[in-house]
């Protein structure tokens, strides 16, 4: 309830927990495209957005479902998928002429090593220039899913039934979770080769 003559009713999107307008203003004043990262219960979304007087214009929009094109059969909402998504988004942005951006994680908490920063790491590796601190980026072992593989291997030995239940989605897709780092590297290689070829072709034209 509003109280007192100086009380200001927050904007609707702020009341609904959708937009931090102070942070958004700082990002817009940077005059750089924004790498917008959002999470849902099942997927992760990355967009490269430019602020215009008439409203935001989305230059690139992609989510982790697009990774299936490159053979990804792992979870679509984990750290590995987040990194690969950032890699794809970064390359797509470069193909559209974007060279630099600022990270926009909205109301997500800025937890070092989290999935939103895995997207950032992927975009950086794709060649985008984005201001950041190295301490927020997840370690390579975590990005590749090594921690998942180690846990899966241990669980498979100690409790095969729980292993099958916990990793049923991986197994249904034909991926042994203990082989996740290898699968990750294979998909990463496909993405890099695909977009590097496109970039080379664009330069040659």
From Swiss-Prot:
One of its GO terms (biological process) is translation. Pfam families: Ribosomal_L5e. The keyword Ribosomal protein applies. Disulfide bonds: none annotated. The keyword Ligase does not apply. GO terms for molecular function: 5S rRNA binding; structural constituent of ribosome. Keywords: Ribonucleoprotein, Ribosomal protein, RNA-binding, rRNA-binding. One of its GO terms (cellular component) is cytosolic large ribosomal subunit. Part of the 50S ribosomal subunit. Contacts the 5S and 23S rRNAs. NCBIfam families: PRK08569.1. HAMAP family: Ribosomal_uL18_A. This is one of the proteins that bind and probably mediate the attachment of the 5S RNA into the large ribosomal subunit, where it forms part of the central protuberance. Belongs to the universal ribosomal protein uL18 family. This is Large ribosomal subunit protein uL18. It comes from Pyrobaculum neutrophilum (strain DSM 2338 / JCM 9278 / NBRC 100436 / V24Sta). The gene is rpl18.
